[in-house]
Amino acid sequence: MDSSSFSFSHLDRLEAESIHILREVVAEFRNPVLLYSVGKDSSVLLHLLLKAFSPAPPPIPLLHVDTRWKFREMITFRDRRVAETGVQLRVHINPEGVAQEINPITHGAAVHTDVMKTQGLRQALEQGQFDAAIGGARRDEEKSRAKERVFSFRNAHHRWDPKNQRPELWNVYNARIHPGESVRVFPLSNWTELDVWLYIYREKIPVVPLYFAAPRPVVERDGMLILVDDERLPLRPGEVSKLLWVRFRTLGCYPLTGAVESRAATLEDIIAEMLLTPFSERQGRLIDYVPGASMESKKIEGYF
């Protein structure tokens, strides 16, 4: 058969690029780990990791930095997927944050994110002595991520310097680091949100049910629809929980993540919705609207 008869879709090319990056990380680094946040991008990353090394089990563990404020359905889904795939999962919760009872209700989005996510991630990476952390960030998500390299260098304090990034020519990646330094690696850098959903549809990848529209109890707060996920969310004066058809485009800590009104209850519906929406998926992340808590400033401090 002539080679010209072979046809590769854009999803095939994205998949091949991501698998190449995953294999490169395993080959080049001493002790890599895959950051598993349980969202759609993490689900795609896990699928790619399994595919990259099949039929052998993945040679690297997964790491979930748990804030204790994730949606209940996320934790249920996480535990089920770990059992189904047989991957090794490490869960880290910042013990200092637990001792101080840090939470998004009392301390606000910025403090909660810094202590339970950023500091928690740095603790977990240091304890595991990981020199490469694979994440599911994409360049189309947010402007600071748009300028970040696939292999994103971090100094010994996990800090990112956006003005001092290494050149990446074609598909050649520089994995050299000094002791104590590390690299964050983003195999989905060139994917879009629509690409992710098309790939999930094609590969039949399981995702958290919260991505699909259903009647859910929500309160309208600060211009967002916040899911009443458990009894820890106190209602403010005048607030009333109401049942609306909503879904989530992005998942994080539930008091800091807004839902969107939608009837997209299937993958086909979600893909059709993606083709029409003019809004970013991060419109539902409360932390992005907090002064001084931009994505770039968080990444400079060690956020993934």
UniProtKB/Swiss-Prot annotation:
Keyword ATP-binding belongs to the record: yes
GO biological process: hydrogen sulfide biosynthetic process; sulfate assimilation
Top EC class, one word: transferase
Pfam family, one: PAPS_reduct
Keywords: ATP-binding, Nucleotide-binding, Nucleotidyltransferase, Transferase
Molecular function in Gene Ontology: ATP binding; sulfate adenylyltransferase (ATP) activity
Matching InterPro entries: PAPS_reduct_dom, Rossmann-like_a/b/a_fold, SO4_adenylTrfase_ssu, Sulfate_adenylyltrnsfr_sub2
Pathway recorded for this protein: Sulfur metabolism; hydrogen sulfide biosynthesis; sulfite from sulfate: step 1/3
Enzyme Commission designation: 2.7.7.4
Keyword field contains DNA damage: no
Catalytic activity, as annotated: sulfate + ATP + H(+) = adenosine 5'-phosphosulfate + diphosphate
Family classification: Belongs to the PAPS reductase family. CysD subfamily.
Subunit structure: Heterodimer composed of CysD, the smaller subunit, and CysNC.
Summary of the function given for this chain in its UniProt record: With CysN forms the ATP sulfurylase (ATPS) that catalyzes the adenylation of sulfate producing adenosine 5'-phosphosulfate (APS) and diphosphate, the first enzymatic step in sulfur assimilation pathway. APS synthesis involves the formation of a high-energy phosphoric-sulfuric acid anhydride bond driven by GTP hydrolysis by CysN coupled to ATP hydrolysis by CysD.
Record's protein name: Sulfate adenylyltransferase subunit 2
Native species: Xylella fastidiosa (strain 9a5c)
